[in-house]
Amino acid sequence: LKVSIVVATRNCEKYIKDLMDSLAKIVEDYIEVIVVDSSEDSTPAIVSEYGFAKLIRLEKLGLNVARNVGVREAKGDIIVFTDCDCVVPKEWIENILKVFKEEEAHVVGGSAVNFYEGLSLITDYANEGIWSVMPIYRERIVFDRDSFRKVRLPPGNNLAFKKEIFDKGYFFDEEYRWGSDEVDLLWRLCRDGFKIVADPSVYVYHKHRTSLLELLKQEFRYGMGHYTFFKKNRDSPLAWPAAIGSYVFALFLAALFTSYFLSPLAFLIIGLFMATITVEVYLTLFFYYFKRRKLRLKKCFLYPILDITCHALYLFGFLYSNIRDIIGRISCRTK
């Protein structure tokens, strides 16, 4: 089997050298590397130093446009995706091909392990949070319609597809700008009967967000992306939990805001109810991290705060995109 590794890049000069160095250690005759770049910095110059890489320059049209350009250029039977802020281990491709063979899978993915392990609480949280930004798989998982919403899906920085999938017209949806793009593609494949497998032997090292602000912005954007997924895939079991959560959240906020002007007593009651729910959620998460996960006490105290804050911003991102979509449709009708 021939393998094509596709990397879509934009302004990655800070990270790209580490990725290219790791790819240089795994390149063989049957492996090609395609970098589709839309950068305004020195990223393309750095990539050009690596003779094994095919560099394609593209105007800034979005991540998924770049991915699809890479797919159309790929010659491999297997097309593998990773990102510029990753580092791949030497056995990465070998393990991917092994899972394809053992499971007769159409898609293989895996973990995104913290490159900065132990650097800070923020970087550790991405793997250790209750619904981790970047998943770690402890066992092999085969996804179906039922498990699609129960287990974290493999991330787009560590996904491999049989070329035949793209030959049949399944591509990344280029409307997505803020996340959930790989979820959309995986859902369409799962719905149509293709076999998707995640395996712990298939992993990359990912440079997780290192600051709280970066993490919170990421969660807000993921919420925006999920609204696009919800709008396009209401038949998916993954579409509705965040949507329902967002609308209930909005209802409580609207009730709190309205009661502030209309009834001080109602404002107090609603505020106390929301505060009580928040405290109960915090304590539940604290004991989960302390008893089940056996994390250090500092993490047990702080991770629930991050969980609540990140999920709130995710819901805000969903609502923000929803409101923008409604305003856009109203504007179109009035023109």
Regions found by a protein language model. Give the residues of each.
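Catalytic donor/gating beta->alpha subdomain of glycosyltransferases that bind UDP-sugars
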Residues: Y116, D173-W178, E182-R234
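Conserved donor NDP-sugar-binding/catalytic core segment of glycosyltransferases
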Residues: E91-D124
